[in-house]
Amino acid sequence: MKKNNKLHFIIKSFHWNPDIREKVTEELCSYEERWAKRILRRMTYDLNWIVKINAVESLGTGQELKSLRRLKKLTNSKDELIRTYAYVSLIDVVMNRAHDSEIEGMLYWLKRRYRRENSELMKLFVVPALYGYGYEEAFIEFQKLVNRNLKMENICKNDYTWRMIHALEYMSNDTNHRQIEEELRKIKPFLNNVQKNYIETEWNKDI
């Protein structure tokens, strides 16, 4: 998108205003200019949780090295959701940069971090993201995550069925209908009526 001088001025002048910060992060998502990503990086330090997480997510649309470094630091956040979004945006930025050496390095680093990561939520976001970039072996890992998190002792502690639904919807394509439907059948006994209705009406899947 071409730079809008008026919007640029408004955002640079007022982006710390508490009433508009959240809207600013959403608006800046569609801007690729350096000034926009610079503001978003600043907003990843925001004390408002929603503003911060929106900024982390929006950085994923860019390809700046500074954004890559900031996101890598945020993967150490104690906040599970901030950490999760930082991982996904980090993958997006590396793929946007499209340097083979960086992609190989990121995958090696991510594999080591993944083994040490205790957050099942993070894994349920990261694995579909990798699958979306063509790493088909990620689907096998997703199946393992589904099997593990559908155990009653785990689902009573953390119900990730909504995340599983959205991940399957994201990964669905013309070549994997059967696999997607098999996973949906696995989680069906754990779904409530709202979730079943979403799959049948919004996603047009018959389960």
Predicted stretch roles:
Residues K2, K78-E80, L107, L124, ...:
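Short linear sequence motifs
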Residues M1-K12, E33-Y45, E64-N76, N96-R113, ...:
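Amphipathic alpha-helical scaffolding segments comprising HEAT/armadillo-like alpha-solenoid repeats
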Residues M1, F14, P18-R34, R42, ...:
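Structural detector for internal amphipathic alpha-helices that build alpha-solenoid repeat scaffolds
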